[in-house]
Amino acid sequence: MKIDYLTLFPEMFDGVLNHSIMKRAQENNKLQINTVNFRDYAINKHNQVDDYPYGGGQGMVLKPEPVFNAMEDLDVTEQARVILMCPQGEPFSHQKAVELSKADHIVFICGHYEGYDERIRTHLVTDEISMGDYVLTGGELPAMTMTDAIVRLIPGVLGNEQSHQDDSFSDGLLEFPQYTRPREFKGLTVPDVLLSGNHANIDAWRHEQKLIRTYNKRPDLIEKYPLTNADKQILERYKIGLKKG
């Protein structure tokens, strides 16, 4: 996969992209990273990339010329995903990360002002994505967050391919509780079932815990999850237990 970042602050990406999984993915030729400062593509002597909005209003708006000119240098095909980071976009999700992990080329357009000239949005962008109902100073941090979520799903990037399949959201539920040594710590013990060696019982316990944890922390996900009759019975028993105290 190749990822290009159009940004006014390419140095922001150095730390994140050169460590841990990102670094290994590049070393193993699974990922090619390129940052482009689109200020270099400004058309006047002052390297101006923003201007006041037509019609008045607060803040500055990114001009179209630098972004369009930078895109022309990237050899972007029709198959590439060009992502605009913006609060009005589609909320980012695990499902979106899975979809984007299959792309060969992704371009992130990272703004840093009040907004974008609408012509950038309508003529260059394939996906508008938001990280949530809040506003950040720029698109760089969301782009880095998305990159981490996407790249770890590329086959061969993680040492253990099973790892991401057990992650929260991979099957629509939150992850089950995890324990490691010691068996007892400050009077807190590991559930006996995890020490039993019975893998069927362990799997059943983990699924039950995923259902309960999701029910408590993300009821919106439970509403979307295709509950089996057995799942419904698990949750009903849990609710009855809560009422009994």
Curated annotation (Swiss-Prot):
Enzyme class: transferase
Subcellular localization(s) per the UniProt record: Cytoplasm
Catalysed reaction equations from the record: guanosine(37) in tRNA + S-adenosyl-L-methionine = N(1)-methylguanosine(37) in tRNA + S-adenosyl-L-homocysteine + H(+)
Major location (coarse): cytoplasm
GO molecular function: tRNA (guanine(37)-N1)-methyltransferase activity
GO BP annotation list: tRNA N1-guanine methylation
Keyword Nucleus: no
Pfam family of the protein (one): tRNA_m1G_MT
Keywords assigned: Cytoplasm, Methyltransferase, S-adenosyl-L-methionine, Transferase, tRNA processing
SUPFAM superfamilies recorded: alpha/beta knot
Protein EC: 2.1.1.228
Binding site for S-adenosyl-L-methionine: 111, 131-136
Coiled-coil ranges per UniProt: none
Keyword Methyltransferase assigned: yes
GO cellular component, one term: cytosol
Family membership: Belongs to the RNA methyltransferase TrmD family.
Primary role: Specifically methylates guanosine-37 in various tRNAs.
Quaternary structure note: Homodimer.
Cross-referenced HAMAP family: TrmD
Name of this chain's protein: tRNA (guanine-N(1)-)-methyltransferase
Source species: Staphylococcus aureus (strain MRSA252)
